[in-house]
Amino acid sequence: MEGISIAKLLIIGALIVLLFGTNKLRSLGGDLGSAIKGFKKAMKDEDTSAARTTAEETPAERVSHKD
């Protein structure tokens, strides 16, 4: 089995450009980039809020039982 060669990748790329056009591909790339940025920002915000919550928690009081 040969796999995908450079020539096949170029043909597939040319077909995609012909089907969608360069403007559509640019807008899709921009949308994908902003979605990834938003995801990274949300993950970063979640990490900082989780760290803040952990730091703000106070230890529980010990309960002593009388026998």
Curated annotation (Swiss-Prot):
Residues spanning the membrane: 1-21
Gene Ontology molecular-function annotations: protein transmembrane transporter activity
Keywords: Cell inner membrane, Cell membrane, Membrane, Protein transport, Translocation, Transmembrane, Transmembrane helix, Transport
Topology in the lipid bilayer: Single-pass membrane protein
Compartments (UniProt record): Cell inner membrane
GO cellular component: TAT protein transport complex
Region (Disordered): 44-67
Pfam families per the UniProt record, alphabetical: TatA_B_E (PF02416)
Gene3D superfamilies assigned: 1.20.5.3310
GO process annotations (BP): protein transport by the Tat complex
Function summary: Part of the twin-arginine translocation (Tat) system that transports large folded proteins containing a characteristic twin-arginine motif in their signal peptide across membranes. TatE shares overlapping functions with TatA.
Protein family (similarity comment): Belongs to the TatA/E family. TatE subfamily.
NCBIfam families documented for this protein: PRK01614.1, PRK03625.1, tatAE
Protein name: Probable Sec-independent protein translocase protein TatE
Organism: Pantoea ananatis (strain LMG 20103)
Gene designation: tatE
